[in-house]
Amino acid sequence: MAEASFGSSSPVGSLSSEDHDFDPTAEMLVHDYDDERTLEEEEMMDEGKNFSSEIEDLEKEGTMPLEDLLAFYGYEPTIPAVANSSANSSPSELADELPDMTLDKEEIAKDLLSGDDEETQSSADDLTPSVTSHETSDFFPRPLRSNTTCDGDKESEVEDVETDSGNSPEDLRKEIMIGLQYQAEIPPYLGEYAGNEKVYENEDQLLWCPDVVLESKVKEYLVETSLRTGNEKIMDRISAGTHTRDNEQALYELLKCNHNIKEAIERYCCNGKASQEGMTAWTEEECRSFEHALMLFGKDFHLIQKNKVRTRTVAECVAFYYMWKKSERYDYFAQQTRFGKKRYNHHPGVTDYMDRLVDETEALGGTVNASALTSNRPEPIPDQQLNILNSFTASDLTALTNSVATVCDPTDVNCLDDSFPPLGSTPRGQVNHVPVVTEELLTLPSNGESDCFNLFETGFYHSELNPMNMCSEESERPAKRLKMGIAVPESFMNEVSVNNLGVDFENHTHHITSAKMAVSVADFGSLSASETNGFISAHALHQHAALHSE
């Protein structure tokens, strides 16, 4: 029969009632490809079978009516109307009239992969195509769920959840409740206190009752009072056509006059002028106390009045604050104290720490930079001293350096030691040493291209130089220092200028190029040229050149 052949050749046929369940392996389903060896084995198994009987059975089934075909495979017609009209209709019309019995692919995948959930991850689309009921009757004798049934089940599940929670769909709808029917009913005040309630003993004072006079007349009254008192701000609003601002004092006068507008205007004008004349200007001491209190207490005007400005009321402090913010005094105060960005100091709940960090950094940076500029600013050099410096000649400095240079032994690593012995017996005269302003590093190039000192910046150089790297083939030699101290008489300074300077050091001639030397000279005494040797002297240590001066 066709059932046996399908059961042996197709995995789908394994779900028939006569065959056992077929569970595909992970190798067959995960990578979604057919194993060629399995196909060859199936072909070899089917070589001895005769398929002519199967073809004949299929041809017979193709010409059979649908109801006979369903009965042949064990199905009973579930729809009588379809069975009655099957004789007068074609199979294609019957297929159109049948309900949508599209297979639930997820359900089939669960049935096929029930034992290998962790090993196989193939989808239902790779396993079965979408077929209708009359095509699947040959393979699946049990009834299958359709998509419509599944959708209906999902909707019913949602309804069950809503009913279980106790909220119907109508209750979940949001409705804006507007209207008189939604307003609360407030019972009338009886004026009696319960036994456990404390009687209110304070006497209240009514300041204004809006239900007695019409609103239009109240606006006219406010406009008239502003015109009579000459309030420029309110007059500007009236001319611009904006709404009139309430004046509590004028409304209170209208209430005291039993809503008589003319009498209220006259009384308000008299009291208003008296109150304006009674306001006195703040003194300088009060202004400073107010500003200092703002830095301490922030905008807590009660503490400001209590601790710093006791001569004024809290209302006067508040009024002065708004006038003070519009003055130039506030601009100067905010510039000096950054009052506008110090809100976090008065309100610890604010967590804008980045703004606080930026503000404090800017404040510290401004203070440090100002002090650094003040301390590092050199004193101006007088014109007389500049003329002395410009009178240097190259020959004078060359003679100076050649007179004090000696040969250093290259094999002695410690020939330039930092610990120079003091000059004890060297004759000295009265000299004025060159004052030091800043200290710069003299560095030799490490690539060995040129034997020269490079002075990267123009400035005043200390007499005791920092460690400098020497141009030499021995790159691993430790850094050495050259200590120099120069005391120059006036006669020598008048003739020497700097154009080119050469120094012999360790049998290498080093030229100081692209350098500008400036010496800050405080005072030169009247010295003769013969006294030069008393100020410029050479001291040899381990056969090396050293210039040292106290």
UniProtKB/Swiss-Prot annotation:
Annotated positions of the Phosphothreonine modification: T163
Q: Does the keyword Transcription apply?
A: yes
Q: Would the keyword Nuclease be found if you checked this record's keyword annotation?
A: no
Domain ELM2 positions: 174-272
One GO term (biological process): negative regulation of transcription by RNA polymerase II
Record-linked InterPro entries: ELM2_dom, Homeodomain-like_sf, MIER/MTA, MIER1/3_C, SANT/Myb, SANT_dom
Give GO MF terms, alphabetically: histone deacetylase binding; transcription corepressor activity
Q: Where is the sequence biased in composition, kind Polar residues? A: 121-134
- Where is there biased composition of kind Basic and acidic residues? 17-36
Query: What are the Acidic residues biased-composition ranges?
Result: 154-163
Start and end residues of each SANT domain: 277-329
Protein keywords: Nucleus, Phosphoprotein, Repressor, Transcription, Transcription regulation
Sequence positions bearing Phosphoserine: S52, S53, S114, S156, S165, S168
Ranges for the region named Disordered are: 1-60, 113-170
Source taxon at top rank: Eukaryota
Low complexity bias: start-end ranges: 1-16
User: What function does this protein fulfil?
Assistant: Transcriptional repressor.
Q: What is this protein called?
A: Mesoderm induction early response protein 3
